[in-house]
Each structure stands twice: as C-alpha cells, then as structure tokens.
C-alpha cells in the first residue's frame, strides 16, 4: 500500500474527528436507537429509522477515516525548506493574462479545499508547479484550459483548517 502525504495539521484534524466519532457520536447514537426502539413498532418508527441511518453514516465515516489515516505519511511542512515549491509550500502565482495573483498551499488529497487555497499534491496545477522557484513561468495545462503563470513567491505559512 502506497503512503499518501498529509500535513501534520490535516492528520491531527482527522484524528480529532475520528476520536469524536468513536467516543461521542457512536455511543450517543446507540442510546438514541435504544430509546427509539422502546417506542414500539419499528416499521413505522421514524425516530428509529433516522437513528439507524445516522449510525450507518457514523460507521462509514469511521471506516473512511481509519483507512485514510492508516495509509498516511505525515509531513510537517515547518521542517522542509521552501526555496522551491514542494509539499506543504505556500506560494503566489500570477496569471500572466489577467495579472491576478493567487495564493495556494500544497496539501494532501483529503485536506484539499481549492476555494480556501489548499490544493492537492496530486492536482494538475500542483504537479506542474512542484520544483518551481520565484521567477519561473509555466504554461499550466488544466482541465478547463491552459493558463500562463509566473511564480512570485514560495514560503512556509502555518496551515489552519479551522
């Protein structure tokens, strides 16, 4: 099984979520099912069916998080030099056509949120920018077309997913 890179911040966030699901949500839903079961006929018991559905969701998420965490290689971006774009780097690129400047941070796939500037290590843009330094220009081939970018800055910035 190939290990997937993830920042220490994303790893800790997923661990907290898994702990919450196992120690709080799972026991709570078991109680809710027992209470709903006590209300009689299970065929027409909406509370019972809603609780069972929630239990399925919780168990599926626990399994998903456990699987993700088991194949994670934790990387602390603070320990990496950020002279060139790499995993955990924050960088600014300028669209050479519009002169609009974008700031992105390269993170693991489960952490990615492009709307907040977190792009997956495996995304087409990240793959084309890995190894680039300020001043480099690329013609990025993306799913929605090609964009010419210039790398303006590469640096480390503490990541927060909250």
Curated annotation (Swiss-Prot):
Sequence similarity: Belongs to the GreA/GreB family.
Name the Gene Ontology molecular function terms of this record.
Answer: DNA binding; RNA polymerase binding
Q: What is the lineage of its organism?
A: Bacteria, Pseudomonadati, Campylobacterota, Epsilonproteobacteria, Campylobacterales
Under NCBIfam families, the record lists:
greA, PRK00226.1-2, PRK00226.1-4
Described by its record, this protein's role is as follows:
Necessary for efficient RNA polymerase transcription elongation past template-encoded arresting sites. The arresting sites in DNA have the property of trapping a certain fraction of elongating RNA polymerases that pass through, resulting in locked ternary complexes. Cleavage of the nascent transcript by cleavage factors such as GreA or GreB allows the resumption of elongation from the new 3'terminus. GreA releases sequences of 2 to 3 nucleotides.
Recorded protein name is Transcription elongation factor GreA
Q: Which UniProt keywords apply?
A: Coiled coil, DNA-binding, Transcription, Transcription regulation
The UniProt entry, under PANTHER family, shows: TRANSCRIPTION ELONGATION FACTOR GREA
Q: Which gene encodes it?
A: greA
Q: Which Pfam families match?
A: GreA_GreB (PF01272), GreA_GreB_N (PF03449)
Which InterPro entries does the record match to this protein?
GreA/GreB_C_sf (IPR036953), TF_GreA/GreB_CS (IPR018151), Tscrpt_elong_fac_GreA (IPR006359), Tscrpt_elong_fac_GreA/B (IPR028624), Tscrpt_elong_fac_GreA/B_C (IPR001437), Tscrpt_elong_fac_GreA/B_fam (IPR023459), Tscrpt_elong_fac_GreA/B_N (IPR022691), Tscrpt_elong_fac_GreA/B_N_sf (IPR036805)
Q: Which residues form a coiled coil?
A: 45-65
Q: Is ATP-binding found in the keyword set?
A: no
SUPFAM superfamilies in the record, alphabetically? FKBP-like, GreA transcript cleavage protein, N-terminal domain
In the record, biological process GO terms are: DNA-templated transcription elongation; regulation of DNA-templated transcription elongation
């Amino acid at each position: 099984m190939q290990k997937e890179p993830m920042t220490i911040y994303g790893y800790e966030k997923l661990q907290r979520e898994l702990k919450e699901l196992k120690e709080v949500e799972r026991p709570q839903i078991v109680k809710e099912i027992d209470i709903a079961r006590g209300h009689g006929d299970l065929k027409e018991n909406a509370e019972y069916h809603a609780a069972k559905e929630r239990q399925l969701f919780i168990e599926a998420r626990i399994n998903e998080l456990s699987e993700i965490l088991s194949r994670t290689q934790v990387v602390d971006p603070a320990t990496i030099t950020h002279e060139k774009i790499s995993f955990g780097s924050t960088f600014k690129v300028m669209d050479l056509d519009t002169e609009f400047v974008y700031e992105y941070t390269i993170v693991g796939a489960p952490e990615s949120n492009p709307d907040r500037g977190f792009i997956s290590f495996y995304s087409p843009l990240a793959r084309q920018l890995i190894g680039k330094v300020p001043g480099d220009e690329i013609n990025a081939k993306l799913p929605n077309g090609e964009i010419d970018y210039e790398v303006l800055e590469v640096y480390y910035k503490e990541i927060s997913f909250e």
